[in-house]
């Protein structure tokens, strides 16, 4: 039976052998005793807060889910409903592109708004208001188009109902998880960067993974409904012509590699979830922070293969 230590040892050996530029790794897996976990971790660099990049999109999904649980938003209602009269806060005369009046928060969080906006390192400052620029562009229907601007716009819409999203997440998500004084980058207009700009330690990112694995409950306290954690790895949007691990996308989650699904940020920030029935310890979460953009996919594939190998040795 594999343990957190056996998983950790195998992944550490692989990282050291391949030269993957890891900052830290945290492994959490269930034990044979009901309701208990086994945990192990290793650090190669000082355990300080670093940006988790697109892994922050999972936090945005949790924020939207909490607001939906409160009855403040409906993820399947057109966002035009929330923008009527108030706009985005920075302007009330908001112009929507053709077809955008039918776009919902779910579409924005699953990257299926059909609005095309290529990524730019300076996108938060390229326009007076990124969300307004995004929404004025036409929608091609329910077409997958990955864009940081999509998540950013979702959080701007959410802001019309919950107030400052950073404050809302701090109170309703970070505080129950024991996360204090978390920094989240803001745009020039004062709104959180949403799908990027969030800085966490390896173990802090792992706490979010723990919450997601346990379907919205931590230490017996429900923070968000299970359906929003499930939405990160169900109802996949299928993609064609892409590499392994990028063929399926849900609400912030990528399907694969292999038996895994994951939240994946640039430069190797990953929450790798193994919840298959084939696992002898279903519920394993491997958290990785790194500075190795091009080696991350191979490392995730190794983790998937190693979990399968350790299962076969049981």
What spans do the regions from the language model cover?
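Active-site-proximal alpha-helical segments within enzyme catalytic domains
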Residues: 153-157, 196-217, 269-291
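A short, well-structured edge-of-sheet supersecondary motif
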Residues: 2-46, 272, 282-287
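Active-site Gly/Thr loop motif
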Residues: 181-183, 226-288, 293
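Non-transmembrane alpha-helical segments in soluble domains
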Residues: 12, 65, 80, 106-109, ...
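Short, gly/Ser/Thr-rich active-site loops of penicillin-recognizing serine hydrolases
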Residues: 297-314
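Active-site helix/loop module of the DD-peptidase/beta-lactamase fold
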Residues: 70-111, 160-200
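Active-site SXXK
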Residues: 51-76, 108, 154-158, 208
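Catalytic-site signature segments of enzymes, centered on catalytic residues
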Residues: 46-47, 115-197
């Amino acid at each position: 039976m594999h343990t957190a230590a056996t998983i950790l040892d195998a992944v550490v050996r692989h990282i050291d052998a391949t030269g993957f530029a890891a900052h830290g790794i945290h492994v959490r897996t269930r034990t044979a005793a009901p309701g208990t976990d086994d945990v192990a971790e290793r650090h190669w660099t000082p355990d300080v807060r670093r940006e988790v990049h697109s892994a922050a999109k999972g936090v945005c999904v949790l924020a939207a889910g909490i607001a939906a649980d409160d009855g403040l938003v409906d993820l399947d209602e057109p966002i035009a409903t929330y923008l009527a009269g108030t706009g985005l806060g920075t302007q009330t005369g908001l112009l929507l592109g053709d077809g955008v009046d039918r776009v919902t928060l779910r579409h924005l969080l699953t990257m299926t708004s059909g609005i095309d906006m290529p990524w730019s390192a300076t996108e938060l400052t390229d326009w007076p208001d990124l969300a307004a620029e995004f929404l004025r562009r036409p929608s091609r229907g329910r077409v997958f188009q990955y864009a940081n601007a999509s998540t950013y716009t979702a959080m701007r819409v959410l802001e019309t109902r919950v107030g400052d999203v950073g404050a809302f997440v701090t109170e309703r998500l970070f505080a129950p998880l024991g996360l204090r004084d978390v920094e989240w980058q803001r745009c020039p207009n004062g709104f959180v960067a949403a799908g990027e700009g969030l800085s966490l330690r390896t173990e802090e990112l792992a706490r979010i993974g723990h919450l997601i694995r346990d379907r919205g409950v931590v230490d017996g306290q429900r923070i968000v409904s299970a359906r929003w954690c499930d939405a990160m790895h169900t109802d996949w949007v299928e993609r064609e012509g892409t590499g392994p691990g990028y063929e399926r996308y849900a609400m912030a989650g990528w399907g694969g590699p292999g038996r895994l699904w994951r939240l994946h940020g640039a430069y190797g920030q990953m929450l790798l979830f193994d919840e298959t029935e084939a696992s002898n310890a279903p519920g394993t979460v491997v958290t990785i922070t790194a500075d190795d953009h091009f080696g991350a996919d191979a490392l995730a594939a190794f983790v998937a293969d190693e979990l399968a190998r350790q299962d076969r040795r049981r």
